[in-house]
Amino acid sequence: MAFSGSQAPYLSPAVPFSGTIQGGLQDGLQITVNGTVLSSSGTRFAVNFQTGFSGNDIAFHFNPRFEDGGYVVCNTRQNGSWGPEERKTHMPFQKGMPFDLCFLVQSSDFKVMVNGILFVQYFHRVPFHRVDTISVNGSVQLSYISFQNPRTVPVQPAFSTVPFSQPVCFPPRPRGRRQKPPGVWPANPAPITQTVIHTVQSAPGQMFSTPAIPPMMYPHPAYPMPFITTILGGLYPSKSILLSGTVLPSAQRFHINLCSGNHIAFHLNPRFDENAVVRNTQIDNSWGSEERSLPRKMPFVRGQSFSVWILCEAHCLKVAVDGQHLFEYYHRLRNLPTINRLEVGGDIQLTHVQT
């Protein structure tokens, strides 16, 4: 079964988690699990690619264990019986630290990348097309699980061009509470063609239906600032925009603007010098009234990474930071399709944009 696009991600799902892989595993599918290893007494976590929800048939069991110096077990379970373990004694995960774990399905094997470095290759013991479920359990907190089909991209993913155990050309992973969602890893730092994926999300672990116009992902290693791009089709209810990056250690301010012609329909402006997140609209070069109230403390921290989700609804924009709902901003410019430009500037390193 061919993919026409990519499955929407699961956002901040509770652990233990089991979710459907729409259409099952396909050659070329990339699945990314992004989260943080808990600092608790737990010593293991696992990511399973399995048939159904029983756990009796697991095509690929990826199981980091913080025991005996740390190691990772890979295995397959058929009809409730485990096969011989394959162990890798290097432990790429750290307790209390975020991680970015990507699985690439290929005809002969799974290739696994951890924090931008190709970590292990696991040859199929059972036909991978039987797999229709992903499950995660153990001592982790999840930020998201995302899906991407590189067949929609006219370039090869870096897994197929980078020698085994060699790092991909991505900037060093910044330490912080959340990490950037990955795109297709380029084999060199040059920009590559954008790819189409679906990413709209409602409640944690749940997904909206596919939007009328699929979102665009711009998988650059890093972005020049300020950054400006077109929002294909403009805004509409269920449209989702995702940005990730790292706040500079000496940051004063940065902004994310959604623009309509010469107007700024939505101005999101974290200000570290004021310990505030300011929201506003500018029409004909005149600013409206600021909105500053927040349900909790300032979510952005100097020197730490962040993710911002902006979800357009009929009457407002809903904004979440690091997977947690932060505020709603009611539309002041109501002709949503004309809001078709994204501008980002200020004291951040921008690492991922999806519109």
Curated annotation (Swiss-Prot):
Which positions does UniProt annotate for a beta-D-galactoside 2 binding? 267, 271, 281, 287-293
Question: Which residues hold a beta-D-galactoside 1?
Answer: 48, 61, 65, 75, 82-88
Give the highest taxon in the source lineage.
Eukaryota
**Predominant cellular place of this UniProt entry's protein:** cytoplasm
Q: Where in the cell is it found?
A: Cytoplasm; Nucleus; Secreted
- What keywords sit in the KW lines? Chemotaxis, Cytoplasm, Immunity, Lectin, Nucleus, Repeat, Secreted
Its BP terms in the Gene Ontology are: cellular response to type II interferon; cellular response to virus; chemotaxis; ERK1 and ERK2 cascade; female pregnancy; inflammatory response; maternal process involved in female pregnancy; natural killer cell tolerance induction
Induction description: By toll-like receptor ligands zymosan (TLR2 ligand), polyinosinic:polycytidylic acid (poly I:C) (TLR3 ligand) and lipopolysaccharides (LPS) (TLR4 ligand) and by pro-inflammatory cytokines IFNG, TNFA, IL1A and IL1B in mesenchymal stromal cells. By IFNG in macrophages. Up-regulated in dendritic cells following infection with dengue virus. Up-regulated in Kupffer cells following infection with hepatitis C virus. Up-regulated in plasma following infection with HIV-1.
Q: What would be one Pfam family of this protein?
A: Gal-bind_lectin
Identify the PROSITE patterns for this entry. Answer: GALECTIN (PS51304)
Tissue specificity is: Peripheral blood leukocytes and lymphatic tissues. Expressed in lung, liver, breast and kidney with higher levels in tumor endothelial cells than normal endothelium (at protein level). Expressed in trophoblast cells in decidua and placenta in pregnancy (at protein level). Isoform 2 is the most abundant isoform expressed in endothelial cells. Upon endothelial cell activation isoform 2 expression decreases while expression of isoform 3 and isoform 5 increases. Isoform 4 decreases in pathological pregnancy.
Record's GO cellular component terms: collagen-containing extracellular matrix; cytoplasm; cytosol; extracellular space; nucleus
Domain (Galectin): give its ranges: 17-148, 227-355
GO molecular function terms here? carbohydrate binding; disaccharide binding; enzyme binding; galactose binding; galactoside binding; oligosaccharide binding; receptor ligand activity
Question: Which function does this protein serve?
Answer: Binds galactosides. Has high affinity for the Forssman pentasaccharide. Ligand for HAVCR2/TIM3. Binding to HAVCR2 induces T-helper type 1 lymphocyte (Th1) death. Also stimulates bactericidal activity in infected macrophages by causing macrophage activation and IL1B secretion which restricts intracellular bacterial growth. Ligand for P4HB; the interaction retains P4HB at the cell surface of Th2 T-helper cells, increasing disulfide reductase activity at the plasma membrane, altering the plasma membrane redox state and enhancing cell migration.
Assembly and oligomerization: Monomer.
The record's section on PANTHER family has: GALECTIN, GALECTIN-9
Would you tell me the protein name for this molecule?
Galectin-9
- Chain's gene name: LGALS9
